[in-house]
């Protein structure tokens, strides 16, 4: 468990304390953006492999057990995470490259300006609730913290990089899904999202639901 906690702390530091902060700006100024992104990607990949190994081998204590009815709710609550994740790949100004930032929010950006991180947050929160043991709490809680803290961190980074266009983008979007739409600052345009992201998201959700035991050794639903 100690190794898992140390690796989790390192993951949070790298993805929240470094990426998106002025410390990142200082490192980029020295080695360049491409070198930073390549190093960051490789380091993250290695670290996530180590996290999985540490999680699988950690001693754990069960704090609660999700009842069958709750597991059904959690299973269906995962569906929006898959749809958000798939939709986030269409011209995402808050992702790497910031494509289309000056053009204003479109598609899933009207729902939340951080669709990918929001999908990770939903995924992590559901797995924290559904597992209920200390090792899973540390492992999935790490990604939950990273996703939730990463949203304002990216906001701050983009505010520094794009002071001319970012305020207008923020004024028409929200972190919380559908908040900007509910407040009248934007409107849902389903045609901009298209049919493919939701359909693929549903298919992936159903596939993971069905094969979860085969892939990860644990069934999603208990009958």
PLM regions: where:
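Loop-to-transmembrane boundary segments
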Residues: 107-108, 114-115, 179-201
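Juxtamembrane boundary at the C-terminal end of a transmembrane helix
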Residues: 206-223
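Membrane-proximal soluble regions of multi-pass membrane proteins
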Residues: 156, 160-191
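Membrane-interface helix-loop junction between the first two transmembrane segments
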Residues: 16-35
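Portal/gating segments that form or line small-molecule/metal binding sites
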Residues: 43-107
């Amino acid at each position: 468990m100690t190794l898992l906690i140390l690796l989790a702390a390192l993951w949070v530091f790298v993805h929240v304390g470094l990426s998106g902060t002025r410390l990142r700006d200082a490192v980029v100024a020295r080695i360049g953006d491409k070198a930073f992104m390549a190093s960051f990607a490789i380091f993250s990949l290695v670290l996530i492999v180590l996290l999985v190994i540490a999680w699988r081998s950690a001693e754990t204590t069960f704090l609660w057990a999700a009842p069958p009815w709750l597991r059904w709710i959690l299973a269906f609550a995962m569906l929006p995470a898959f749809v958000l994740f798939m939709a986030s790949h269409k011209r995402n100004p808050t992702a790497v490259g910031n494509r289309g930032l000056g053009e204003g929010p479109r598609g899933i950006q009207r729902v939340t300006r951080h669709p990918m991180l929001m999908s990770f947050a939903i995924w992590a929160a559901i797995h924290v609730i559904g597992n209920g043991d200390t090792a899973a709490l540390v492992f999935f809680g790490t990604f939950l913290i990273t996703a939730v803290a990463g949203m304002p961190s990216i906001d701050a980074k983009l505010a520094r990089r794009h002071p001319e266009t970012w305020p207008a983008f923020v004024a028409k979007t929200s972190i919380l899904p559908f908040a900007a739409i509910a407040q009248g600052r934007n409107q849902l345009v389903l045609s901009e999202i298209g049919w493919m992201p939701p359909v693929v998201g549903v298919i992936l959700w159903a596939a993971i639901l069905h094969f979860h035991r085969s892939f990860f050794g644990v069934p999603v639903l208990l009958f």
